[in-house]
């Protein structure tokens, strides 16, 4: 039986009332959104410091980042996820996100986070080359050869 989005419509409306431990992928997706939001914020700060943004561009970026943060907090409330739980502790690697106020782009930090590493890689630029095989039940179904150029600068 094929399941269409319309068949699951009522289930999706009630997901917000489920307990935290049944929130499914919501905490993970919110964590990724917050990571991307903070990466964009760091890039806006870098461009502001280098005088690469006009005043209207800076205002638009600041407004957009603020609205995105509000939406993430609203979704956290809907799914009963504590925003502090979005910062995952990765053991020896450190935390995913820096603690509030502890990181400013371009400045060294006493306890670097994964976000800081990604921000520095974006600022410097990096090329990732590799192959990915995706599958299920020990059957390779998708083969991909990738070359990814990750940078905040125009290519």
Curated annotation (Swiss-Prot):
GO molecular function: structural molecule activity
UniProt keywords, alphabetically: Gas vesicle
Record-level GO cellular component terms: gas vesicle; vesicle membrane
A matching Pfam family: GvpK
Stretches that traverse the bilayer: none
One GO-annotated biological process of the protein: gas vesicle organization
Subcellular location(s) per record: Gas vesicle
InterPro entries: Gas-vesicle_GvpA-like, GvpK
Family named by the database record: Belongs to the gas vesicle GvpK family.
Role: Might be involved in nucleating gas vesicle formation. Gas vesicles (GV) are hollow, gas filled proteinaceous nanostructures. During planktonic growth they allow positioning of the organism at a favorable depth for light or nutrient acquisition.
Name of this chain's protein: Gas vesicle protein K
């Amino acid at each position: 039986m094929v399941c269409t989005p319309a068949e699951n419509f009522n289930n999706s409306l009630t997901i917000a009332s489920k307990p935290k431990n049944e929130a499914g992928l919501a905490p993970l997706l919110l964590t990724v959104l917050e990571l991307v939001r903070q990466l964009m914020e760091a890039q806006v700060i870098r461009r502001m410091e280098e005088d690469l943004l006009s005043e209207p561009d800076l205002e638009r970026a600041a407004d957009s980042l603020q609205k995105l943060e509000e939406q993430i907090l609203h979704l956290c409330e809907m799914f009963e996820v504590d925003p502090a739980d979005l910062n995952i502790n990765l053991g020896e690697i450190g935390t995913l996100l820096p603690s509030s106020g502890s990181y400013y782009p371009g400045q060294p930090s006493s306890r670097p986070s994964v976000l800081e590493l990604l921000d520095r890689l974006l600022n410097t630029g990096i090329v990732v080359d590799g192959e990915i095989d995706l599958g299920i039940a020990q059957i390779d179904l998708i083969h991909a050869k990738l070359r990814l150029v990750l940078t905040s600068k125009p290519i």
